[in-house]
């Protein structure tokens, strides 16, 4: 009996030290309507630049007094920068019909345009609105299209509370960003 307890004690300690089983939420872009007359057939989407709180794996929301707090027991299922970049590429592909891919560009022939997105804010505000703000730049390595930089200030309602509502709001905000980029190109 003592021998069995001696063997089980280290196993119990290892189980207690195991990783937590936090809920993980996917980053996606809601589907949207197609944009006609896009001059670019190929789009390289560079890794989205995020502020440190938005690049962390924890999902954050604004609390009383304006401070940002991690929503307990909830994390993004993917690295937020990579997840937002992939969602934006999927959204652009669906909206434009252009071949949109995350950097590095996977084909031998270079892309018609490169999209660089820099996010200033990405969080669920205390007033029930999700804010996604920053700027995007479209560059043309071969000079085939006009290059430009545009700000974006996207506000979408957060329907409900908690991390799933914040994840849904981010999805809709990314879909709106894909729409704005598509129309600008």
Predicted features and spans:
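Sec-dependent bacterial lipoprotein signal peptides
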Residues: 1-17
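A structural "domain/chain start" motif
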Residues: 17-80
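Soluble periplasmic/extracytoplasmic beta-strand elements of cell-envelope proteins
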Residues: 42-48, 60, 114-118, 131-137, ...
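Surface-exposed short loop/turn segments
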Residues: 18-36, 90, 95-142, 159-160
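Short secondary-structure boundary motifs at beta->alpha junctions and helix caps
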Residues: 67-77, 142-183
